[in-house]
Amino acid sequence: MTAAPRNPLIVIPARLAASRLPDKPLADIHGRPMIAHVLDRAREADIGPVVVACADAAIADAVAAAGGRAVLTDPAHPSGSDRVWEAVCRVDPDGRHDAVVNVQGDLPTIDPAAVRAVFGPLARPGTDIATLAAEIVRVEERTDPNVVKAVVELAPGARDGRALYFTRATAPWGEGPLFHHIGLYAYRREALARFVALPPAALERREKLEQLRALAAGMTIAVAIVDTVPLGVDTAADLERARALLDPRTGARPALP
């Protein structure tokens, strides 16, 4: 039986080349770059050290100014997972960290409890990867292809289960809840090493969902159910919402946009 991971490393991948909101890791939120706020949230989770895997020197400089640790990675990486793995290998070549938590760099309002929640299911024997989902409550999201659905084998009353599929379609069919997948991941270290070495899968290319590569290879993904979906900053409007949520005058930081 594989022992439960006990020493996670949090890695935040970040790059400037975003099509809808260029330079978004450096976007100003109340006098600080967005990446500094993400760094704060990851530190507040208090489950392990935090590293930012940067594609650009400007991001590394911003992280250093915020008192964080940054690693410059190959800007040509095809995915955030590849960037995360390079950072892991560089900061921990001896393999002291037995798990890796990937926190996306565009989640400045993420609840630190969500970061802790995604790490928890790795304790279950046989789990390679863990991620999060929340029940869809907005009717329009059920048919929105930009809202990725997690199809989860979930016992009645359970708060975590096993992923059967991820899709942009409305699934599963029939009565019952649908779950909005949240792109936060925790990996056993050996699972991340295996994942980045795999070739893209046919369904991954069709759905444009990287996590399907793991399912196609027979890897087990656990899904923890949380109450809310964090605000991902992809547009100028999202940025304004993040600024409102992080306004120091209100003192509030809700996880739900």
UniProtKB/Swiss-Prot annotation:
Catalytic activity: 3-deoxy-alpha-D-manno-oct-2-ulosonate + CTP = CMP-3-deoxy-beta-D-manno-octulosonate + diphosphate
Listed HAMAP family: KdsB (MF_00057)
InterPro entries on file: Cytidylyl_trans, KdsB, Nucleotide-diphossugar_trans
GO BP field: CMP-keto-3-deoxy-D-manno-octulosonic acid biosynthetic process; lipopolysaccharide biosynthetic process
Keyword Transferase carried by entry: yes
Origin species: Rhodospirillum centenum (strain ATCC 51521 / SW)
Location of this chain's protein in the cell: Cytoplasm
GO molecular function: 3-deoxy-manno-octulosonate cytidylyltransferase activity
Family classification: Belongs to the KdsB family.
Alphabetized NCBIfam families for the sequence: kdsB, PRK05450.1-1, PRK05450.1-5
Protein name (Swiss-Prot/TrEMBL): 3-deoxy-manno-octulosonate cytidylyltransferase
